[in-house]
UniProtKB/Swiss-Prot annotation:
One CC-aspect GO term: GINS complex
Purpose: The GINS complex plays an essential role in the initiation of DNA replication. Has a role in chromosome segregation.
Provenance organism: Aspergillus oryzae (strain ATCC 42149 / RIB 40) (Yellow koji mold)
Top-level taxon of origin: Eukaryota
Name the record gives this protein: DNA replication complex GINS protein psf2
Region called Disordered, residue ranges: 92-112, 241-269
Organism phylogeny: Eukaryota, Fungi, Dikarya, Ascomycota, Pezizomycotina
UniProt biased composition (Acidic residues): 260-269
């Protein structure tokens, strides 16, 4: 008997998409330019840095033809600060640390300014707005703006795990980095599960779960759990509504039904 297909995108598929994230490498050998589906890749000339898709960077790393430079957020200091924001800041007690700003979106230090999203254009003139994994959220930076807090990109868990598995010797203190990533995942998973408590009110229009800053893998892993809870609450609400209608019909049949009761209920709702 075949099992039903999982809802939404699966974790292996999310990891596959994350391999298109651009990372920074330091080539150890010369390599001619490549023509890929995502666009051309410039020739690799040591010791000049280059930005490549993660899957190609991992391939060159396994062949010992390049070293991968970790993104700024994958340093122990940055992860420790993000973990502190997630656990100790009252503002983010039930929320997630702010994600990196999108193109045209003001950063935290420029909060209050009007966002101006700048579109990009395809070779045939089509307009589009880039989004992960097509944003430079995982490339190395020589200079990080002062006052700009570190933030986790959309594919933080997948990129961090793959870099720890294949390029741990290129990371700063990989053991501590792995521990901090594990703690961050546990803290954020607990927030997602605790947010399910408000879904009962959300099913009746009373609230919802804020998912701003949630990563791709977290969405994929929590989709089945949250969808199951919502379906269960919907069934419970339907049974309550059916029982209420049956009670109304019985009261009307007995002549004891008061129409003003529904008006009061609607006003309270």
């Amino acid at each position: 008997m075949a099992f039903p297909l999982p809802r939404g995108i699966t974790p292996p598929e999310i990891s596959f998409l994350a391999e298109m994230e651009m990372v920074t490498i330091l080539p150890r050998q010369r390599l001619e330019g490549l023509e890929l589906l995502g666009g051309p890749v410039e020739p690799l000339l040591p010791p000049r840095r280059a930005s490549l898709p993660l899957w190609l960077a991992l391939l060159l790393k396994r062949q010992r033809r390049a070293n991968i430079l970790p993104p700024p957020w994958l340093h122990p200091e940055s992860l420790s600060l993000i973990l502190e924001i997630e656990t100790q800041h009252h503002e983010y007690q039930h929320a997630f640390s702010p994600p990196p700003p999108l193109p045209g979106q003001p950063s935290l230090r420029d909060r209050g300014k009007r966002p101006v999203a700048m579109p990009r254009y395809t070779p045939d003139g089509g307009r589009y707005y880039p989004a992960p994994p097509f944003l430079p959220q995982n490339v190395a930076q020589d200079h990080v703006p002062s006052g700009e807090p570190p933030s986790l990109p959309f594919h933080w868990l997948e990129v961090g795990t793959m870099l720890l598995d294949a390029a741990s010797d290129d990371l700063v203190d990989p053991d501590q980095t792995r521990r901090l990533l594990k703690e961050l995942r546990e803290v954020r998973t607990a927030k997602i599960r605790s947010g399910v408590d408000v879904l009962d009110a959300a099913s009746t229009g009373g609230g919802g779960v804020a998912l701003t800053g949630v990563g791709a893998m977290e969405v994929g892993e929590g989709r089945g759990f949250i969808a199951g809870v919502v379906d269960g609450l919907r069934k419970i609400g339907a049974s309550k509504e059916q029982a209420r209608r049956e009670q109304m019909a019985e009261d009307m049949a007995n002549g004891g039904y008061d129409a003003t009761q529904d008006d009061d209920d609607d006003m309270e709702f």
